[in-house]
Amino acid sequence: MNGKRPAEPGPARVGKKGKKEVMAEFSDAVTEETLKKQVAEAWSRRTPFSHEVIVMDMDPFLHCVIPNFIQSQDFLEGLQKELMNLDFHEKYNDLYKFQQSDDLKKRREPHISTLRKILFEDFRSWLSDISKIDLESTIDMSCAKYEFTDALLCHDDELEGRRIAFILYLVPPWDRSMGGTLDLYSIDEHFQPKQIVKSLIPSWNKLVFFEVSPVSFHQVSEVLSEEKSRLSISGWFHGPSLTRPPNYFEPPIPRSPHIPQDHEILYDWINPTYLDMDYQVQIQEEFEESSEILLKEFLKPEKFTKVCEALEHGHVEWSSRGPPNKRFYEKAEESKLPEILKECMKLFRSEALFLLLSNFTGLKLHFLAPSEEDEMNDKKEAETTDITEEGTSHSPPEPENNQMAISNNSQQSNEQTDPEPEENETKKESSVPMCQGELRHWKTGHYTLIHDHSKAEFALDLILYCGCEGWEPEYGGFTSYIAKGEDEELLTVNPESNSLALVYRDRETLKFVKHINHRSLEQKKTFPNRTGFWDFSFIYYE
């Protein structure tokens, strides 16, 4: 059973070169002159319009649905077969996970070629007439296949030249419980996406198209069916771009210097192994080599148990953090935290921890930590001693800054310097080490995204994980570091209970937390009362 209507044999002919050509048309009811004028008037006036062959709505932005786009079912079945025989490539980054075909612009398969002509000649002409937009002949289309846990998160599709987006669905019988809906977002006063206000369910031969604009935020929700594939052809009609509103910049998250707190707080909270000076030297050597380290069993067991109990059973007030084109997770209201969690937050802001992190990393996060200049003087003194005692030194010269950040520049020459060295040196000399942090709750559907205004700067990331027992990488929720402008992963940090992750990143490195998919619900089999996991997330600046 495939739920499709019985098909009449579609017309076919043999082309000049002996190749089979197939014929098809899009819904002639849509092209009927009276209806066409009504649709054009609704588009012009930005008013809703509903008819059995086409529906236009303005909420939350202009979009249209043609339930039965192609007239020949036989053609659609032939098209589906050709598409399923294409090579698909996995598309995977912070924003999406699905499979995509190569560009269909030059494919010669008969059904694909015919659909291309229908869309970018016949339908484009009709669309130009009703929208009064001078749409170009640019062909921009591909085939996408979404399977279990695949998704495309919130975005606006806006790119130079894109005017109208379209999706033609070729799916088996489908309902809302299977996911894969096209979700449309409302916007707030800053033209940022706010919440999903409409979800369009895929169905066989349904065409959806919408105007690409600064407010056309949408997503493909996660596919929840383990048996069925969500197959579609999508693309854009190009034309003159709309004027964008001024960019909105979120208020910066406040940073604060350390809280005066003596070293006793470390002895109360932290595994004594990590307070041993010799072990700290070992940690620093490893950190300076790779710019990242995972310190397991970081908190004392009794403290960590109390923290987890407070998170799991305590009265923590959570609020959702957005907007969804940048992030979606829950943040704790710090002023209302149970006392044990307040104390843990205080630990990560304490003067003693700033100094401990300096010892772990070699960064100057405390005035007692040695500066690069101090280290250079020590090295010069040591080299002088070597030359005096041995007559010569066979050690290779050390680079001026031995603290390498996580970066896509794995082999930097000694001549590479900061773009603004003098300004940065002044900042370093006059700046006070700062931090910002929050307690986060991660569960199914949560994520963070890299966006146009993601700030890339030198920083030390600290994450302490809680409630991650049984958590698998395939669930998502890991923190991924990538080179700016690239999809290549430089480092992945997987959630691990009572493990402290430290990562030093540079201006060419960005990070995101991968979308947590529905596989994560398997955690409930072992921990029925637990939903996701938690982390204490802090960023430190020299």
From Swiss-Prot:
Its EC number is 1.14.11.-. InterPro entries: Oxoglu/Fe-dep_dioxygenase_dom, Oxoglutarate/Fe-dep_Oase_C, Pro_4_hyd_alph, TPA1/OFD1_N, uS12_prolyl_hydroxylase. Disulfide bonds: none annotated. A motif (Nuclear localization signal) lies at residues 4-20. Residues 400-416 have a biased composition (Polar residues). One of its GO terms (cellular component) is cytoplasm. It comes from the Eukaryota. One of its GO terms (biological process) is protein hydroxylation. Binds 1 Fe(2+) ion per subunit. GO terms for molecular function: iron ion binding; L-ascorbic acid binding; peptidyl-proline 3-dioxygenase activity; peptidyl-proline dioxygenase activity. Its cofactor is Fe(2+); L-ascorbate. It catalyses: [ribosomal protein uS12]-L-proline + 2-oxoglutarate + O2 = [ribosomal protein uS12]-(3S)-3-hydroxy-L-proline + succinate + CO2. Monomer. Prolyl 3-hydroxylase that catalyzes 3-hydroxylation of 'Pro-62' of small ribosomal subunit uS12 (RPS23), thereby regulating protein translation termination efficiency. Involved in stress granule formation. Belongs to the TPA1 family. This is Prolyl 3-hydroxylase OGFOD1. It comes from Homo sapiens (Human). The lineage of its organism: Eukaryota, Metazoa, Chordata, Craniata, Vertebrata.
